[in-house]
Amino acid sequence: MPTIQQLVRKGRRDKIGKVKTAALKRSPQRRGVCTRVYTTTPKKPNSALRKVARVKLTSQVEVTAYIPGEGHNLQEHSMVLVRGGRVKDLPGVRYKIIRGSLDTQGVKNRKQARSRYGAKKEKS
């Protein structure tokens, strides 16, 4: 326990919290190249084949990123834009690929939440 005089001299240090998206190096997004595109199964109560990709970022870190939406055109060597955001039922997946930017196409026939999936407005 410090004395009052020690606190006057030195003060208290703020604790530094852990960054959840370390590979982005404090950027909102980062560009990367897909090294492997595959499917994986989620944790216990859920059942599906979730689409994910291993991506080597421009920060020289390789991460696993989730491909949101139905259907995708990604393959090895595709250029993608990656943002933070984990997938709760996939352990180790802490990043998501942004649809509709670089080599990633938007989701076809998407009516709601279009901006999240890079889908253009349909002509009526």
UniProtKB/Swiss-Prot annotation:
InterPro entries: NA-bd_OB-fold, Ribosomal_uS12, Ribosomal_uS12_bac. GO terms for biological process: translation. The keyword Hydrolase does not apply. Residues 105-124 are annotated as: Disordered. Keywords: Methylation, Ribonucleoprotein, Ribosomal protein, RNA-binding, rRNA-binding, tRNA-binding. GO terms for molecular function: rRNA binding; structural constituent of ribosome; tRNA binding. GO terms for cellular component: small ribosomal subunit. With S4 and S5 plays an important role in translational accuracy. Belongs to the universal ribosomal protein uS12 family. This is Small ribosomal subunit protein uS12. It comes from Mycobacterium ulcerans (strain Agy99).
